[in-house]
Each structure stands twice: as structure tokens, then as C-alpha cells.
Amino acid sequence: MKIDVYVKGRWYLSEPTDLSGRQIDDIWQFLDGRRIADPGPLSIPLSRPGKALDIDFAGAGQAPIVKASLANVFRVLAPNDVQLFPVKIEGQAEPFFLLNVARTVRAIDDAACEEARRWAPEDDEPEKIGQYHVVSGLRIDKAKVESERVFRLWGWPSPIIIDEEIKEELERVGASGARFDEV
């Protein structure tokens, strides 16, 4: 599951802030694929007004933001895989939630991907050695997925991987702003 940037007239969300408007300390924590401490009440300003989406990804940190009906899908079908934190979106009365994916699985199938390259010592990025540098035509090895229904990928955290039942339920309740690609 990832952002559908082709929704005409869509809104764009800024970085999450606390209720006084201060940016939170670590905007990247929502990409880590691990449980986090409750960040407390959050607010999300709009960087560009437009059509409200059912799911979007806020700011540079790409924190997933979902409306209440989608949050309920995750709460019911994947309670051990996610955390949901209420957020107030500028100009919206409807409740939204920050979706923190709390699981990471080492499941990229390098051989089945169109391309999968990892950071190497000669790349002069020592903290990234072994992590993925490029992944295109993403494919996962489903045998490496155990009970997880929603997770991030080790070394390549941007996509949110969801199982088929969750995808179908999200589509049934309405998931404007999301794009689903089989991996």
C-alpha cells in the first residue's frame, strides 16, 4: 500500500505537530516498523488544501494518516501489527488516525525483484551497509512472512505491506489516496 499521487485536486499534509504547532522530535519514527511510545495529541496542518483523502502520508516523514473507518479495519484485522494515534487535521471535523506499522519483516525476494541493490562499503554510507539502496519491481518471499498481516520491509521501509483480506476490506469501506500493488 502506498500513496496514490494521481488523485485530482487532492490535499497535501504537512508534518505532524503537537497541539501547540511544534514539530515532533522524530518525524521518521513512523517508517521504522516498530512499536513507539504514544506521541500524545497530534495535529496535522495542510501544506496544500484540496480534496480530503481516506488515507494519506504526511510530510517528509510519510506518516500514514487514515480516516476512522480505515483505522477500524486495521484495529479489527491487525491489532498486533499496528498502533493508531488520534490526529486532528486542519479544517477537518472527522476523526483521523496516525497509523504506525509496528512490525518489520525481512522478506524482500532479491532474485524475484526487477532490481534489488544493497548499500556496500564502497558507497561511503557505513550506517546503511547491507540495507537496500535500490528496489524496483518489488517482490516478497511470502514464506518469510509468519503471522504478520501488516508490516514494513527490513531495509526498504517505504511501502506498507498488507495481506489480501485487509486490502479487500479497505477497498470495500473506501480507500481514496491509497494504491495497492501486488508484491
Question: PLM features: what roles do these ranges have?
Answer:
Residues 1-183:
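Phosphate/anion-contacting hairpin/loop surfaces
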